Amino acid sequence: MDVARPLTVLVPSLDGPVLEALARTSRPVTGREAHRLAGAGSESGVRLVLARLVEHGLVNATQAGKATLYVANREHIAWPLVEGLVNLRRELFARMGKLIAAWSSPPATVTVFGSAARGDGGLDSDLGVLVVRPAGGEEV
């Protein structure tokens, strides 16, 4: 799983980074700013994605002078699915925490490191986890 861009699991196109960018902000943004926040594609490509998402109702657009401002439509029936995909990394760590909490002998510490901790890995990245057992604890 790509923990840096979790939406790519189901949305491998430019739509994924655009939806993720809008999910991570609650304020209206211009097409140019959406492109910057998405960090992918071209500005014109992002504008095409935004227009299509507006057409489907996932994004709301309003005019502000000559600019068009875009904001996620969090009331859309599909928006919780977008949020779920955007938050996959958080869900991964929450599940890891639950599993570790269920161990009969709790660890002294558990640390995620590397690209998974930074949130910048890709499909080729591993999930670096350091588990330190308490002194005299049982072996795993």
Show which residues each predicted segment covers.
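Helical scaffold of the NTase/Pol beta-like nucleotidyltransferase catalytic core
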Residues: 1-110
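Catalytic metal-binding acidic patch
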Residues: 114-139
